[in-house]
Amino acid sequence: MFLYGENTKGRRVLPIERRDALPFILNIHYARRVPSISYAYGLFIDGKLVGCVTYGSPASPSICKGVAGEEHRKDVLELNRLVITDPSKNNASFLVGNSLKLLPKNKYIVSYADYEGWGHIGYVYQATNFLFTGLTNGHKDNFNNGKHNRHNGIDLNNRVMRNRKYRYIYITYSDKRKRRELLKALRYPVLKYPKGETRHYDLNNPKPCKEIEVFSEKN
């Protein structure tokens, strides 16, 4: 079996079990919640697992239909968690780029950069050739003591506006003809990449940190 990233500065990207991704998701990622996980891949540096990326079904059926319509709603996956503990240059894009090669073909991969909430631009997606399709629409979420309320009896007065996010889409394809077909079905416009300062958070105090730049613009 070919291992993506083999002999590339000691880095490898390999499939991992869901349980191997959980410590990264629950203890490091700012959301601190476990999403739907259909595929998980790890970044190994000199044999040590230092990061993971997970893909799963989008949380909302409307996301699936919104990408390319009813016909392709089952072809949509979401890159829903990306966690790197070794922030060395290009590790994040190396992990994402190589994991995309391991996913099933002829799928739409949607992911979001939380620009309004966390100051994320999405340079890792730009570096791995995702298509930029604009900002999501803002809408209100229901919360109870700061947590999403998934039960009946929602207090309509206890609602907050969800941050709009930059939406990125990648198409895995089996051949160029299929890529053209899937691209034609895409329901969002393809726009120029956004630029600007991007920020990350302190793992012990996950709030946006303006002064810390993670990915820098090169082009």
Locate predicted features.
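Short, cationic low-complexity segments
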Residues: R180-N219
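Acyl-donor binding region in acyl/amide transferases
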Residues: R12-P15, G56-V160, Y170
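Short amphipathic alpha-helix that is part of the acyltransferase structural core
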Residues: M1-S36
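A conserved mid-domain beta-alpha-beta active-site/ligand-binding segment of alpha/beta enzyme cores
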Residues: N157-R180
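Conserved beta-hairpin
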Residues: I25, S38-Y55
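A short, aromatic/hydrophobic, helix- or strand-capping loop or linear motif
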Residues: P35-S38, G196-T198
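Short beta-strand micro-motifs in enzyme catalytic cores
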Residues: Y39-Y41, D75, R164-Y168
